[in-house]
């Protein structure tokens, strides 16, 4: 009996063309270029999920450093003072405090400075 494979390949093509919706030109219309574009976009997405973590950590450190320097401490001295004080807040929370809750961050900076001396 003759086996017709149109349905399987159609579904496979449709999967890539649906994923390429919103791409410009042939990248959303032609199967081969759409597949290449989609696979490349998946590579970028995988890579940038890793980069995102690094970028946010850099941003948090930058904000904590700015907040600490307003109280006469460097970032490293501030973090060391917090460790000596037994305070284990992560950088995300500390950065949020430095931006939104300046009074609370000032208390933490004061505590860190007192533990350093």
Swiss-Prot record:
Keywords noted in UniProt: Ribonucleoprotein, Ribosomal protein, RNA-binding, rRNA-binding
Any single biological process term in GO: ribosomal large subunit assembly
SUPFAM superfamilies according to UniProt: Ribosomal protein L20
Domain of life: Bacteria
Any GO MF annotation of the entry: structural constituent of ribosome
PANTHER family: 39S RIBOSOMAL PROTEIN L20
Role: Binds directly to 23S ribosomal RNA and is necessary for the in vitro assembly process of the 50S ribosomal subunit. It is not involved in the protein synthesizing functions of that subunit.
Protein's recorded name: Large ribosomal subunit protein bL20
Organism, as annotated: Nitratidesulfovibrio vulgaris (strain DSM 19637 / Miyazaki F)
């Amino acid at each position: 009996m003759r086996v017709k494979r149109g349905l399987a390949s159609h579904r496979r093509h449709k999967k890539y063309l649906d994923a390429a919706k919103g791409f410009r030109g042939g990248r959303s219309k032609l199967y081969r270029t759409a597949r290449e574009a989609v696979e490349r976009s998946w590579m970028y997405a995988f890579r940038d999920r890793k980069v995102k973590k690094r970028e946010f950590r850099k941003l948090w450190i930058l904000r904590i450093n700015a907040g600490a320097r307003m109280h006469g401490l460097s970032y490293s001295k501030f973090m060391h003072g917090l460790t000596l004080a037994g305070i284990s807040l992560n950088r995300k929370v500390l950065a949020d405090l430095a931006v939104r809750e300046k009074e609370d961050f000032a208390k933490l900076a004061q505590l860190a400075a007192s533990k350093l001396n």
